[in-house]
């Protein structure tokens, strides 16, 4: 029985409810009065239920699709303005005991070299990332209790935060590791992590168990209930994601929204972020062998509807996607992107060797400077801000500020201050020239006179060598 307040995976992600929802969506995909009613509700920026959003996803009317895209862009700007938060993944270890059939790190893949970074290696990677200009990382590691125990992860986090090379500093470490215990989540909280990220991969239980035939990840309930344990362990911000291409996209979309509704119902706080990765080629993984791949057009529609249905969430897209796709979905709701990513262990400090393994092939291979310049040329502010985490604006406090729109009073000036840091320390002359012009224009767009004056003062101080100012 479907119950969003239940702590049992098969009740808050109820297969029968998803099937009923998809049937309802099919029956109403051409019901224009209902669709207009749903769109009118969406314009209130309070979100949509999984059933309402599924009707919009099923609708194929071109005029409605145009309206969905326009509304997604409006909602994104209402909550996040024209800012795009920058981050990079940092792969610590590709040792893994699981048998995931879509990931090259699976245990049966014997021809890839296995590698685990030492703390000295971690420091080298962090320096390389700082020298690009990154301030925010998402650490990644395979599940292996012998090679990658929680103590190893904690040591890596400590090392990352300790490195300050020249003017560089990693100010926020997000963590994407396997589902674990409440006790271990408490340890991650104490280590000062930002968001705990865990991709569900697929919400379809039967498919999930086939795709994860061996290893601890085979346990669907333990994996699906991980966010509840994380929040019980004190982690304020959690990030959801499915791997589109493993199962029918409409099923996954519905399940993802049900998970968000569950977190809101039980904990009073929905997902801080939602990621939208698609299955991509990697080492011994051929995505064409999976039957549920989605087109760029469908992918864009999913992104737009996630923004409409969960307006407060940060939406993340990685370098799995091409520059063309990233540019489209940034205008449909995506608010965070990775830049200059390396998806192999040790990929930043060393030249990638042909024998190195990547978790997935990188489609957007531009440098961080090139990505920053591209964003500004498309009228977006690249933001390296991490202030909310360090000012305690997390969990329900962040959500209340975000839902009310007040978060922009902090985020807009903070984005400009951190962009100024990037321009002073890491940018090419061409990028710096474009950025200086953008900062001057955007400072004048800060509505509060006092905030605008303080922000201008901080930007001037950064120009004279001082760092790390924030609202």
Task: Give the positions of each predicted feature.
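Canonical Radical SAM [4Fe-4S] cluster-binding loop centered on the CxxxCxxC motif
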Residues: 80-121
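An N-cap/entry alpha-helix motif that binds or orients negatively charged groups
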Residues: 40, 44-84
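Conserved C-terminal portion of the radical SAM core fold
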Residues: 141, 195, 200, 221-285, ...
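Core AdoMet radical
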Residues: 107-123, 128-230, 236-246, 268-275, ...
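Radical SAM enzyme core and accessory elements
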Residues: 1-37, 41, 327-335, 341-471
């Amino acid at each position: 029985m479907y119950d969003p307040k239940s702590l049992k995976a098969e009740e808050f992600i109820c297969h029968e409810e998803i099937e009923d929802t998809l049937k309802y969506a099919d029956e109403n995909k051409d019901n224009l009065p209902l669709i207009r009613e749903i769109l009118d509700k969406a314009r209130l920026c309070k979100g949509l239920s999984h059933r309402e959003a599924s009707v919009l996803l099923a609708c194929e009317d071109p005029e409605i699709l145009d309206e969905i895209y326009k509304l997604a862009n409006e909602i994104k700007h209402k909550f996040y303005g024209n800012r795009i938060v920058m981050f990079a993944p940092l792969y610590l270890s590709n040792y893994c005991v699981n048998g995931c059939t879509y990931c090259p790190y699976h245990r049966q893949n014997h021809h890839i070299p296995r590698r685990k970074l030492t703390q000295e290696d971690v420091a080298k990677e962090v320096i390389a990332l700082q020298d690009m200009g990154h301030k925010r990382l998402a650490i990644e590691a395979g599940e292996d209790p012998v090679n990658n125990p929680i103590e190893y992860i904690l040591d890596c986090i400590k090392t990352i935060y300790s490195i300050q090379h020249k003017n560089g500093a990693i100010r926020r470490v997000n963590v994407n590791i396997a589902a674990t215990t409440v006790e271990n989540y408490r340890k991650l909280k104490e280590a000062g992590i930002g968001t705990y990220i865990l991709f569900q991969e697929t919400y379809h239980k039967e498919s999930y168990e086939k795709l994860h035939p061996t290893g601890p990840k085979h346990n669907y309930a333990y994996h699906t209930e991980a966010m509840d344990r994380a929040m019980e362990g004190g982690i304020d911000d959690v990030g959801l994601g499915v791997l589109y291409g493993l199962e029918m996209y409409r099923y996954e979309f519905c399940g993802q929204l049900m998970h968000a509704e569950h977190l809101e119902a039980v904990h009073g706080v929905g997902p801080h972020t939602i990621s939208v990765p698609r299955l991509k080629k990697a080492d011994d993984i051929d995505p064409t062998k999976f039957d549920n791949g989605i087109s760029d057009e469908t992918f864009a529609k999913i992104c737009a509807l996630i923004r409409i249905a969960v307006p407060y969430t940060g939406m993340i897209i990685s370098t799995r996607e091409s520059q063309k796709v990233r540019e489209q979905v940034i205008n449909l709701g995506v608010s965070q992107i990775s830049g200059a990513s390396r998806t192999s262990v040790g990929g930043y400090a060393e030249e990638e060797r042909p024998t190195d393994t990547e978790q997935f092939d990188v489609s957007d291979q531009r440098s961080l400077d090139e990505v920053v310049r591209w964003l500004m040329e498309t009228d977006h502010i690249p933001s390296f801000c991490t202030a909310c985490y360090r000012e305690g604006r997390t969990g329900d406090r962040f959500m209340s500020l975000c839902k009310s729109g007040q978060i922009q009073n902090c985020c807009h000036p903070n984005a400009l201050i951190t962009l100024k840091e990037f321009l002073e320390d890491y940018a090419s002359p061409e990028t710096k020239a474009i950025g200086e012009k953008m900062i001057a224009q955007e400072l004048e767009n800060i509505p509060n006179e006092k905030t605008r004056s303080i922000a201008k003062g901080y930007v001037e101080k950064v120009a004279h060598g001082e760092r790390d100012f924030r609202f």
